[in-house]
UniProtKB/Swiss-Prot annotation:
This is ATP-dependent Clp protease proteolytic subunit. It is found in: Cytoplasm. Its main location: cytoplasm. Keywords: Cytoplasm, Hydrolase, Protease, Serine protease. The active site is at S106 (nucleophile), H131. The gene is clpP. It comes from the Bacteria. It comes from Rhodopseudomonas palustris (strain BisA53). Belongs to the peptidase S14 family.
Amino acid sequence: MRDPVETYMNLVPMVVEQTNRGERAYDIFSRLLKERIIFLTGPVEDGMSTLVVAQLLFLEAENPKKEISMYINSPGGVVTSGLAIYDTMQFIRPPVSTLCTGQAASMGSLLLCAGAKDMRFSLPNARIMVHQPSGGFQGQATDIMLHAQEILNLKKRLNEIYVKHTGQTYKAIEDALERDKFLTADMARDFGLVDKVIDKRPEEASPAKPV
């Protein structure tokens, strides 16, 4: 049976450009990276996190002042992988705008709200979901206690990040994240996860700038 990832990659369109040195072919994602657009799609895990972090650092090296756009469609995933992306977004000098297409759940919602001020967007039919971290561990009783304390520490840290970027109180965030909380784009805007819901790009805007 063929690897589904290999099958998918074989379907990625190629873009051919004419240059002074002849034709040059890019896969569609590499071509959009030239426009400073990063796609964060699928589960957040170590491999995907490494690629996104590398792209952020590359675009900063190219131009430390020019905006980077991140398009998010993710069900979430591993907390530490997501925090690696989050920390890099805050670390680099270029402002990072975020745009939710499809869904931004769990760590996806945290990365969505972590965009630069007034540069966090959602398409009208996107869905956003926030909740507390989950996990499981087997082993000695003492080790289980240590891991339980660690997940509580992670929960507290994630709550603090949401507080920072949404403007909500810690209590409001804690209550909202107690269970899976599903939000429409408008509800996410009212909650402070995004700044604006957009349904059409202005004619003068470039692909890297949603509004």
